[in-house]
Amino acid sequence: MIKCSILLLAFLVAVTLSYSQHSVRFVISALPLTNSNNSNLFVAGSFNGWNPQDKNYHFQKNEQGSYSLGIKLADGAYEFKITRGGWDKVECKKGGANIQNRFLKLSSDTTIDLMVEEWADNIERKPRVSTAGKNVRIIDTAFLIPQLNRTRRVSIYLPSDYSATKKRYPVLYMQDGQNVFDDLTSFAGEWSVDETMDSIGNHTREMIVVAVDHGGDKRINEYCPYDMEKYGKGEGNKYIDFLVKTLKPFIDKSYRTEKNKKNTFIAGSSMGGLISMYAILKYPRVFGGAGVFSPAFWIGPEIFNDIAAKGAKVNSKIYFYCGAQEGETMQPDTEKAFSEMRKISKSTMVCVVRADGKHSEWVWKEEFPLFYLWLMEK
């Protein structure tokens, strides 16, 4: 009887899991008149790391001229937009105004009918200008990542009094560098970290910020330390080795930094949040703090195994943040990581959940000053 009960329970669990994935069919029935007949169309959203040219989310054109795409998603809330392969070619309103992220609340199989009014690159706009402040400079447009045999643009923010003093400063290493300082290079809005540092740096300890650009179509791979069925080999382990063994020594040699753990931090959002959490687990003697913003733990759930195995060795400051409007798994996953770390780690931690928070750069921009002030508290 016990054996039968166990088998029945296993069967019910298997059935439940099989039904937790729903079929979602996107159908684009109307496109701008300017649309090319050979357009490659993609959906980018919170379910694929907002990759604007993800080949796994590529629409197929049918004989009637409409485009369709079928995917599987779990129960939850998702945001997305349609692109032609880049954020410069994202859908917009007919007059060129940006549109809000499309929203999907999923609890069963569904078909979504879409109409695209216009593409952003078809609108004549004033040229975008750089918003990076005078204290931001580019270290290298092609900094070598020997661990991955690739190059990357690396930028740095130096405190306003850097050239006038001989002080040494803490260093924060940030992911998705395109979005950190400059609206010109951002794909979904900038964090305005340089403006934040300029405005509140005088009220607390100032800090050097190093921003490393993401790798475009390699972003998910570089920011995930685990192999993925959908996206392929995880390269996060090598990427973090680059930060610790290549970039940090260069920064410490080239600038007046406080080199020790107490003054070395890392931060990022979404996939950048995942890799920041992994970094502090892998190198607990290097990173004294981490900003884990809206972490994409669902892409790398193995992070919880690493927390269990390595979390006890971490004694740092960790700022967990997520929004309650980021889907069904974001808040539970973030709170789980926080809770599991509290059980085994002596780290100083906080978990912030914003009721109206969405998976968006502007939300992280608003949260960054609070993270910075908390990080600099004695």
Listing of model-derived features with the role each one plays in the protein:
Residues 99-102, 107-169:
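A domain-start/cap signature at the N-terminus of enzymes
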Residues 225-265:
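Gly/Ser-rich "nucleophile elbow"/oxyanion-hole loop immediately N-terminal to the catalytic nucleophile
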Residues 260-306, 310:
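Primarily recognizes the serine-hydrolase "nucleophile elbow" in alpha/beta-hydrolase
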Residues 167-177:
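Short beta-strand element of the alpha/beta-hydrolase
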Residues 1-24:
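Bacterial Sec-dependent N-terminal signal peptides
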Residues 321, 326-378:
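C-terminal catalytic histidine-bearing segment of alpha/beta-hydrolase fold enzymes
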Residues 23-25, 32-75, 85-106, 140:
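Aromatic-rich carbohydrate-binding modules that target alpha-glucans
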Residues 178-240:
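Active-site machinery of serine-nucleophile hydrolases
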